[in-house]
């Protein structure tokens, strides 16, 4: 396990903050993510129940997970990453694999900037662990080997021991015609990268999609490099000797003269056999892809080019393929033009239909109905009672053709008082106002005088008018 520095822990926290949203969307179901955090005491029982209740209340799962990650950000612990990218979580949530690789890239970048890297203390002996600091973080490079040991293979650590031991040395057989090319990504500039044996066990069990793969930078995680002699000889015979993807590997059990450690032969187990078969298939597929991209072998090896007859045949075959490609391309162009024509015709017809529909139709003139004489409809005039305020101290009164203004306060003193003012401004009594209107012989002056088509008698009954005198105005005048 690696001893973490504060700078590396800060870099991991910063990257955790950046990838927090991606992790939230990678978790597509509550189990077993919530349970793993609760069982390892990263979240409380209360937060666990609240998160499940929020999911039952149709709150988006990504939002609930993001809230949990935000709380974990406040109390960040690098051991939380081991629970997050455990074997169970990587199997249940496949999208976490890319995020786990991004954390390894952060460790690789930190190793490139800061030398020396964190110290390698030991490897976990439990093969059931899905992720550890040894696989999550970059591993340091070993010291440079002398030129006589540049062809030595990777050193594999035995899980049962307490120090790094050599279990297998793969030596390169020197070839008189060409030097052996080093395997890219594993041996560079005379340096080797130590790898623990638990990496091989984990790579044999997990799927290749879940395995981290970094082809460019210095890697600490290697899939499997143990191959049989027969497969290596077949690969070397089928591929040019100078290619960067091949390496002649021969097992040598004799100890190196300048190597201080004693080599030990690793036992051949069925898991290693399966790994060899799988690795040989992977290498053969990659070899075929590289052979398609590379030029012919006769150009690389310096062999003379084929004769003119073969070249003519190759030209004829190439012309045939070009003609076939041109014919298929022409067919595609013709079908595309036909589609465009039909589409244009459909659009033009639809535009014409829309124009015809949008044209204004001629309005028909309404036919005049024959006028029927003798039918006169009398519309009743609207009553103006609502417009008159009977509670005002003055009322507009009429008596025949005479018009004037009645003052309620003066009428309370008696009908003999001059309480009506005519249009000329003269003050009149009730009797004088009746004479002006031509109704001097009226027996009831309250019915003869009207206010907006209502008699003073009706106004008195309604409470709008008060008269103290009960005597008739004729007697008062007498």
From Swiss-Prot:
Residues 197-213 have a biased composition (Basic and acidic residues). The gene is Sp110. Keywords: Apoptosis, DNA-binding, Immunity, Innate immunity, Nucleus, Phosphoprotein, Transcription, Transcription regulation. This is Sp110 nuclear body protein. The keyword Amino-acid biosynthesis does not apply. Residues 131-142 have a biased composition (Polar residues). A motif (Nuclear localization signal) lies at residues 279-294. GO terms for cellular component: nucleus. Residues 273-297, 360-372 have a biased composition (Basic residues). One of its GO terms (biological process) is positive regulation of apoptotic process. Residues 385-466 form the SAND domain. InterPro entries: HSR_dom (IPR004865), SAND-like_dom_sf (IPR010919), SAND_dom (IPR000770), Sp110/Sp140/Sp140L-like (IPR043563). Residues 131-310, 337-385 are annotated as: Disordered. The modification Phosphoserine is found at residues 175, 177, 254, 305. One of its GO terms (molecular function) is DNA binding. It is found in: Nucleus. Residues 1-108 form the HSR domain. May act as a transcription factor. Plays a role in the innate immunity against intracellular pathogens. Required for resistance to M.tuberculosis and L.monocytogenes. Promotes apoptosis of infected cells. Its main location: nucleus.
């Amino acid at each position: 396990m690696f001893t973490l520095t504060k700078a590396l822990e800060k870099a991991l926290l910063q990257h955790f903050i950046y990838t927090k949203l991606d992790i939230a969307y990678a978790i597509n179901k509550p189990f077993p993510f919530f349970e793993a955090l609760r069982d390892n005491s990263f979240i409380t029982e209360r937060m666990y129940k609240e998160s499940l209740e929020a999911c039952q209340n149709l709150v988006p799962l990504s939002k609930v997970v993001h809230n949990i990650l935000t709380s974990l950000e406040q109390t960040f612990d690098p051991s939380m990453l081991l629970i997050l990218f455990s074997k169970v979580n990587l199997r249940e949530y496949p999208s976490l694999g890319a995020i786990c690789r991004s954390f390894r890239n952060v460790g690789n970048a930190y190793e490139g900037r800061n030398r020396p890297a964190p110290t390698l203390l030991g490897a976990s002996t439990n093969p059931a662990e899905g992720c550890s600091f040894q696989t999550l973080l970059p591993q340091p490079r070993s010291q440079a080997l002398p030129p006589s040991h540049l062809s030595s293979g990777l050193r594999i650590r035995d899980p049962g021991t307490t120090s790094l031991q050599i279990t297998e040395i793969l030596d390169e057989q020197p070839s008189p015609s060409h030097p052996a090319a080093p395997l890219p990504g594993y041996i560079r500039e005379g340096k080797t990268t130590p790898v623990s044996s638990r990496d091989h066990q984990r790579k044999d069990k997990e799927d290749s999609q879940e395995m981290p793969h970094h082809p460019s930078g210095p890697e600490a995680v290697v899939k499997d490099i143990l191959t049989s002699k027969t497969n290596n000889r077949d690969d070397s015979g089928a591929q040019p000797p100078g290619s960067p993807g091949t390496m002649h590997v021969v097992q040598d059990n004799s100890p190196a003269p300048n190597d201080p450690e004693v080599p030990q032969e690793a036992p051949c187990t069925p898991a290693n056999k399966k790994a060899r078969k799988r690795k040989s298939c992977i290498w053969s597929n990659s070899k075929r892809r590289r052979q398609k991209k590379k030029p012919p072998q006769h150009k690389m090896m310096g062999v003379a080019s084929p004769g003119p007859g073969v070249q003519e045949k190759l030209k004829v075959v190439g012309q045939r393929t070009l003609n076939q490609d041109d014919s298929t391309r022409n067919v595609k162009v013709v079908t595309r033009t036909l589609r465009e024509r039909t589409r244009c015709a459909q659009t033009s017809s639809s535009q014409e239909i829309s124009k015809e529909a949008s044209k204004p139709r001629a309005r028909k003139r309404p036919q005049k109905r024959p006028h029927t004489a003798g039918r006169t409809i009398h519309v009743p005039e609207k009553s103006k009672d609502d417009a008159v305020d009977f509670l005002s101290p003055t009322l507009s009164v009429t008596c025949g053709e005479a018009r004037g203004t009645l003052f309620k306060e003066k009428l309370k003193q008696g009908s003999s008082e001059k309480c009506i003012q005519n249009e000329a401004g003269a003050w009149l009594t009730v009797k004088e106002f009746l004479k002006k209107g031509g109704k001097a012989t009226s027996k009831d002056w309250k019915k003869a005088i009207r206010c907006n088509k209502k008699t003073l008698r009706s106004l008195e009954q309604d409470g709008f008018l008060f008269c103290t005198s009960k005597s008739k105005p004729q007697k008062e005048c007498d």
